[in-house]
A protein has these predicted regions:
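N-terminal secretory signal peptides that target proteins for export/translocation
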Residues: 1-10
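Bacterial N-terminal signal peptides
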Residues: 14-25
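Boundary at the C-terminal end of the N-terminal hydrophobic targeting segment
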Residues: 26-31, 36
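Polysaccharide-binding surfaces and accessory modules of carbohydrate-active proteins
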Residues: 33, 207, 217-298
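Beta-strand-rich recognition/accessory modules
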Residues: 45, 52, 263-380
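Acidic-aromatic substrate-binding/catalytic surfaces of carbohydrate-active enzymes
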Residues: 46-181
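Broad, structure-driven detector of short, well-ordered beta-strand segments within folded domains
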Residues: 55-62, 82, 190-198, 298-306
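Acidic, contiguous internal or C-terminal segments within carbohydrate-active enzymes
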Residues: 73, 162-235
């Protein structure tokens, strides 16, 4: 009897020990899972999605934005290491699908009212009022006319969206899609824009892709955006200099903020056109943040377009009203209905210019981005 009881007690002890080990392993796995996800916090409500990592904060609007829809919301992109934020109207905001050419012959009766529906591009030749003509020259210059292919201008007129939040062990991603709602004469509406934003663990930047799935045949189809974003300033109070890697030779050009004290059109200086400029090794646009209260320099905020050849045109022009517009247009190539094109970018905070180029070398040559259960990856 005693032997049976001893064996029973021994079996019970062994079972309990095994159960304890299983519990420890399971508990450890759960703890590891919690730890893996604790580096990033995602808060979503009816208006927006807020992402907070160990390095960054950012908000992606769903509706009722502080300034523009698409991309990262105005003033929300925070570098925790330095306390500096983006100082424009948001990051990587999207305009519309365009092509070179004139819209003067479009009949007035097909145009929308007060910015809603199809409208002509703001161009000096379309304007009779002197003030409007001057604004058009400052906004878009006079040398490379364009027109809308499909609208609306998403940053201004996009309806509320429901982005998808995707989480992995080493990333948080947000995916937004939208179909263009109206089109120019002879075109169809319905091309799809997709923006995928990935926040990798441990980085002071995000990786972003814009992709277009076209429903039209267009000889030079263009997607326009702001890369990384516009700059708001009063005589250089928020930034000390700008860096453009694609101008001024192989090392790029550093431009003091004083060059942006007075308005100038985009085709006067600091412009890039693929048909007129050498395609650079790296395509980087960055501004050096400055504390407006103390004048002390902070980090650089940079946008890296990872395949330079996709850039069709880019400018950094000072408009009236204290804003530098950082337009970047991609693709500008023959596109058939059913075809797709896109660009991939890295946008974030950097301590210096060499660190931008180091990250560029790590990711260069890519135009696409995808995520799944195994992680995130750039695509060529």
């Amino acid at each position: 009897m005693r032997n049976r009881e001893d064996r029973a007690r021994g079996g019970s002890v062994a079972f309990l020990a095994l159960a304890a080990c299983v519990a420890v392993v399971a508990g450890g796995a759960r703890a590891d899972d919690v730890a893996a996800r604790s580096w990033a916090n995602v808060v979503e409500d009816d208006r927006a999605i807020r992402i907070e990592t160990e390095q960054l904060e950012a908000v992606i609007p769903k509706n009722s934005p502080k300034q523009w829809m698409t991309g990262i919301e105005k003033g929300t992109f925070l570098d925790k290491a330095t306390g500096f934020r983006e100082v424009g109207d948001g990051l990587m905001v999207i305009d519309w699908l365009m092509e070179p050419g004139s819209d003067e012959e479009w009949p007035d009766e097909i145009l929308g009212q007060e910015g809603h529906g199809l409208h002509r591009y703001t161009w000096f030749a379309n304007e009779t009022d002197p003030a409007r003509r001057d604004y058009a020259l400052m906004a878009h210059g006079s040398s490379h006319r364009k027109r809308m292919v499909e609208g609306p201008q998403l940053c201004h007129r996009m309806k509320p969206v429901r982005p998808e939040v995707i989480r992995g062990d080493d990333y948080v991603a947000v995916k937004t899609t939208y179909q263009f709602e109206y089109a120019a004469p002879g075109r169809k509406a319905g091309s799809t824009w997709t923006q995928l934003i990935v926040f990798p663990r441990g980085e002071r930047y995000f990786v972003l892709m814009d992709r277009i799935d076209s429903v039209n045949d267009v000889d030079e189809l263009i997607l326009r955006n702001d890369t990384p974003g516009c700059v708001r300033h009063e005589r250089g109070d928020t930034f000390s200099e700008m860096y453009l890697s694609y101008l001024g030779g192989p090392n790029g050009v550093r431009i003091p903020s004083s060059e942006f004290f007075e308005p100038f059109p985009p085709d006067l200086k600091f412009g890039y056109r693929r048909d007129q400029n050498r395609t650079p090794e790296h395509f980087i646009r960055a501004y050096h943040l400055r504390d407006p209260k103390t004048g002390a320099d902070g980090p650089w905020l940079a946008g890296l377009t990872l395949e330079p050849s996709v850039v069709y045109e880019a400018w950094a022009s000072q408009r009236p009203g204290g804003i530098i517009v950082m337009i970047e247009e991609i693709h500008g190539k023959p596109t058939k209905a059913g075809e797709s094109f896109g660009a991939a970018h890295v946008v974030g905070f950097f301590d210096d210019i060499p660190s931008m180029h180091k990250v560029y070398e790590r990711y260069k040559g890519h135009t696409g981005l995808e995520v799944d259960a195994s992680g995130w990856r750039l695509l060529k």
